[in-house]
């Protein structure tokens, strides 16, 4: 593998933490006392010895901050524990979710940029526990790194690397060219990270282009896997999961079928990502969620259109071996990484420029989604406490009531019956 740090490491004991720097609120109950205490420690060097740079950075910070920007920054700075602001200077809000905010910060001593995710400890309990459980245990060059953690009774502050190169598809749109070989380079990095995770018994469960970020703006930047809020780590020999979660267009059939599943769901998502990388379109796409899920359950996709004539048969074979309804027949991460399309890319992958078609399709999809989001926001009650962005985030996730509705559909019930027969022939997935 091309990553120096990609060697699998043994899973630590349950009570071990690879990230040892965890600050918990102790006897300094009074906020003023805490601020005074940490004022004298703000110039200490980092306890964990150094950092790097990733979490989503979808906004460019302006060189000159006006009064309005300063007011915004102050608003979020005031919400942070004094221990955090004593060590890190809050620069800009770069993301938000239902129970979290992500800010760009700068280490006061080293001037190194980082991202801090502030999570509501009560409302976001399930998410932050899953994310911390995984990130404290992983060390890989294609996976975003956790640097340190601050905890209070009501908030958790996760200091993480900052990826400044933007999202995968934004880079493709901005780039002047994109070939199969470029797609292969991206997928090799992603699969190297996924192999590492699966080797530790970790399923990401929300792989999608928005969670694949470039480390820096340079053309030679690596890809980083981010957002482990839905991830799951096996605690024993039973490597099955049952939670219904994910993003609709990327969710695997076995999750929709409410069957127990394994890390193989990540390979389905990689198949979807690959299809989009090579065409700029979704393999499974419908504004109606029930219809979308029906299509996914059947793995009903095609290579229609002139554009696909320029795509190699090996690339299509790679997609065909990941978008398989039966997870036992689906390629594992290791087999996908060693697939001929990826393994022989330097010699055989097409150099035909796919950029025009892909970028046009991606831009069209972005425009459609933006209009859809505006429509969704306009129909929401003004009494909602959530921001427009969090409404958008909730809408992008699979909702339990949608799956309930799906299972009432007679056509789907027939499809699920055939899936049950597949599952009955396999007692264990090949992972």
Across the structure, where does each feature detected by a protein language model lie?
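Protein kinase glycine-rich loop
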Residues: 90-98, 102
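A short, aromatic-enriched beta-strand patch in the conserved N-lobe beta-sheet
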Residues: 148-149
């Amino acid at each position: 593998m091309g990553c120096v740090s990609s060697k699998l490491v043994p899973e630590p004991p349950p009570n071990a933490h690879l990230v040892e720097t965890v600050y918990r609120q102790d006897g300094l109950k009074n906020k003023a006392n805490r601020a005074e205490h940490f004022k004298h420690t703000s110039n200490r060097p980092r306890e964990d010895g150094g950092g790097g740079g990733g979490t989503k950075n979808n906004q460019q910070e302006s060189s000159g901050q006006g009064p309005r920007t300063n007011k915004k920054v102050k608003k979020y700075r005031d919400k942070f524990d004094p221990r955090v602001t004593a060590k890190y200077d809050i620069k800009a809000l770069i993301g938000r979710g239902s129970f979290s905010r992500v800010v760009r910060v700068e280490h006061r001593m080293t001037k190194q940029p980082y991202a801090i995710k502030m999570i509501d400890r009560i409302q976001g309990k399930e998410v932050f526990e899953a994310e911390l459980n995984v990130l404290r245990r992983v060390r890989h060059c294609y996976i975003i790194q956790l640097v340190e953690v601050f905890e209070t009774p009501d908030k958790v502050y996760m200091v993480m690397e900052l990826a400044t190169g933007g999202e995968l598809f934004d880079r493709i749109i901005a780039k002047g060219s994109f070939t199969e070989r470029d797609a292969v380079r991206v997928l090799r990095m992603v699969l190297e990270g996924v192999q590492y995770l699966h080797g530790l018994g970790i399923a990401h469960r929300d792989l999608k282009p928005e969670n694949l970020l470039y480390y820096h703006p340079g053309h030679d930047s690596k890809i980083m896997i981010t957002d482990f809020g839905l991830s799951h780590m096996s605690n024993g020999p039973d490597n099955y999961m049952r939670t219904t979660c994910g993003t609709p267009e990327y969710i695997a059939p076995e999750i929709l079928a409410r069957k127990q599943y394994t890390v193989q769901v990540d390979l389905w998502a990689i198949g979807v990502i690959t299809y989009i990388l090579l065409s700029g379109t979704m393999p499974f796409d419908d504004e109606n969620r029930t219809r979308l899920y029906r299509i996914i359950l059947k793995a009903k996709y095609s290579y229609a259109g002139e554009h696909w004539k320029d795509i190699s048969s090996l690339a299509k074979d790679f997609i065909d071996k990941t978008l398989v309804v039966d997870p036992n027949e689906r390629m594992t991460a290791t087999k996908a990484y060693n697939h001929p399309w990826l393994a022989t890319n330097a010699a055989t992958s097409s150099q035909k420029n796919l950029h025009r078609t892909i970028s046009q399709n991606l831009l069209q999809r972005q425009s459609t989604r933006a209009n859809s989001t505006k429509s969704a926001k306009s129909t929401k009650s003004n009494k909602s406490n959530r921001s427009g962005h969090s409404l958008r985030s909730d809408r992008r996730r699979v909702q339990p009531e949608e799956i309930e509705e799906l299972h009432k559909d007679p056509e789907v019930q027939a499809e699920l019956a055939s899936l049950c027969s597949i599952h009955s022939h396999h007692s264990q997935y090949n992972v």
